[in-house]
Regions:
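Bacterial Sec-dependent N-terminal signal peptides
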Residues: 1-24
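Subset of outer-membrane beta-barrel
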Residues: 21-173
């Protein structure tokens, strides 16, 4: 019981420091590494390449554009049991919000292992892990603040003060 509570405490601690915002795709199943890192290497074939492009509201000039590309493949096929699978993959995502006001880029690597539960490998249990290096950039020259709007119109000057740390953020997730 003590081990259970220790494991639960570790999981809660990890979840509390995690930061994630996944891009939204209408055909999310076509971007397996974006959807779930446990899907890495889970396919029939030698390798898999996936690419997605999403342009939300294309008639509006301040649209949201999201692009992804991923490559994954199975590894150690001759060293694992025939019913087991292991895969590695890489993923790249770029997301432009509001005509480039907020740009998010990240690249990641993923690893997954699938253990066969029966003699044919029809039933498997798998786990996947993914780590990403994320970069967010805010272009404050394109942002409009409340103090820039006066009864006489748009002044173009703001009293907001930004540091480079607020404009460019890099982190590992």
């Amino acid at each position: 019981m003590k081990k259970f509570f220790s494991a639960l405490l570790i999981c809660v601690a990890l979840v509390s420091v995690s930061k994630a915002q996944d891009p939204n795709f209408s055909q999310f199943f076509a971007s397996p590494l974006t959807l779930n890192p446990a899907l890495t290497g889970k396919f029939d074939g030698v390798f898999r390449v996936a690419g997605n492009y999403r342009n939300q509201w294309p008639t509006i000039s301040n649209a949201f554009v999201t692009k992804t590309v991923s490559v994954d493949f199975g590894v150690l096929k001759n060293r694992l049991a025939e019913i087991d699978q292991m895969g590695v993959g890489i993923l790249g995502v770029t997301d432009n919000a509001g005509d480039g006001i907020l740009v998010t880029n990240y690249g990641g690597i993923s690893l997954a292992y699938h253990k066969g539960l029966d003699e044919n490998g029809y039933h498997q249990i798998g786990a996947g892990f993914q780590t990403t290096l994320a970069s967010k950039r805010l272009d404050i020259t394109k942002v409009k603040f409340e103090d820039q709007l006066t009864p006489l119109g748009f002044t173009g000057v703001t009293s907001e003060i930004f540091t480079n740390k607020q404009i460019n953020v890099n982190y590992v997730d």
